[in-house]
Amino acid sequence: MSDWADWDHIVKIDPDKTLVDGETFEDVAATGTDAIEVGGTTGMTEEKMKRVVDACGKHDIPVYIEPSNPASVVHSDRHDGYLVPVVMNAGDVTWITGAHKEWIRIDDEIDWSRTFTEAYIVMNPEASVASYTQANCDLDADDVAAYAEAAEHLLGQEIVYVEYSGMLGDPDIVAAAADILDDATLFYGGGIHDYESARTMAQHADTIVVGDLVHDEGVDAVRETVKGAKDATATVR
């Protein structure tokens, strides 16, 4: 069974951003989240990534790097592995296979036993990740479901990630992706800011990802989203 099969909640930490004053990575690990993912779209460097991975890796919680480019890859025993984005609706093929090829070409230390992919479906045209990947975000529920099905059954993806990055998404679109998947785990990220938004999205997605909230509002707010996700999962099960 994959590490993420039982995750309800992930905190994503952007190494290019700071935590709320007075809070630590230990505080983040203690929110009740199931895992920490470390990554961001812009401003990523090996030095920034290493600082956050080393700090988070001291605590008893799974830590995964989500590399946005080869420069942000850190080889360390302080993390559990890599979750590498493959952007299904990217207009620039760099973010489907190009960056991945380049990483493999220049890095002879990749541990394939700890390296996995996430099939991203980017939905917010205003988000940095949409601009960065030239993603076509003009998608309806049928489009998203088709991308999700292609990811699982054509490309063998174990994780499908519906990403609204910075805005709360349409639950019906997330539900369409959830309904079409057989075994792949559905991640959802974007705009989760309180108990209710977490509970709503966790009723459809297997795992919700909370990012900006930890940097903007802090661990108390994150803790509420953990509760929302756990309550939704308990109801669904």
From Swiss-Prot:
Disulfide bridge partners, by residue number: none
CDD domains linked: PcrB_like (cd02812)
Keyword vocabulary terms for this entry: Cytoplasm, Lipid biosynthesis, Lipid metabolism, Magnesium, Metal-binding, Phospholipid biosynthesis, Phospholipid metabolism, Transferase
Any GO BP: glycerophospholipid biosynthetic process
GO cellular component term of the entry, any: cytoplasm
Known EC number: 2.5.1.41
Cofactor: Mg(2+)
Signal peptide (residue range): none
Pathway involvement of the protein, from the record: Membrane lipid metabolism; glycerophospholipid metabolism
Chain sites annotated for binding Mg(2+): 14, 41
Magnesium keyword on record: yes
Subcellular location: Cytoplasm
Listed InterPro entries: GGGP/HepGP_synthase_I, GGGP/HepGP_synthase_sf, GGGP_HepGP_synthase, GGGPS_halobacteria
Catalytic activity field: sn-glycerol 1-phosphate + (2E,6E,10E)-geranylgeranyl diphosphate = sn-3-O-(geranylgeranyl)glycerol 1-phosphate + diphosphate
Keyword Lipid biosynthesis: yes
Binding residue positions for sn-glycerol 1-phosphate: 12, 161-166, 191, 211-212
Top enzyme class: transferase
Family matches, as Pfam families: PcrB (PF01884)
Recorded GO MF terms: magnesium ion binding; phosphoglycerol geranylgeranyltransferase activity
Known function: Prenyltransferase that catalyzes the transfer of the geranylgeranyl moiety of geranylgeranyl diphosphate (GGPP) to the C3 hydroxyl of sn-glycerol-1-phosphate (G1P). This reaction is the first ether-bond-formation step in the biosynthesis of archaeal membrane lipids.
PANTHER family named in the record: HEPTAPRENYLGLYCERYL PHOSPHATE SYNTHASE, PTHR40029
NCBIfam families assigned: GGGP-family, GGGPS_Halobact, PRK04169.1-3
Sequence similarity: Belongs to the GGGP/HepGP synthase family. Group I subfamily.
Name this polypeptide is given: Geranylgeranylglyceryl phosphate synthase
Originating species: Haloarcula marismortui (strain ATCC 43049 / DSM 3752 / JCM 8966 / VKM B-1809) (Halobacterium marismortui)
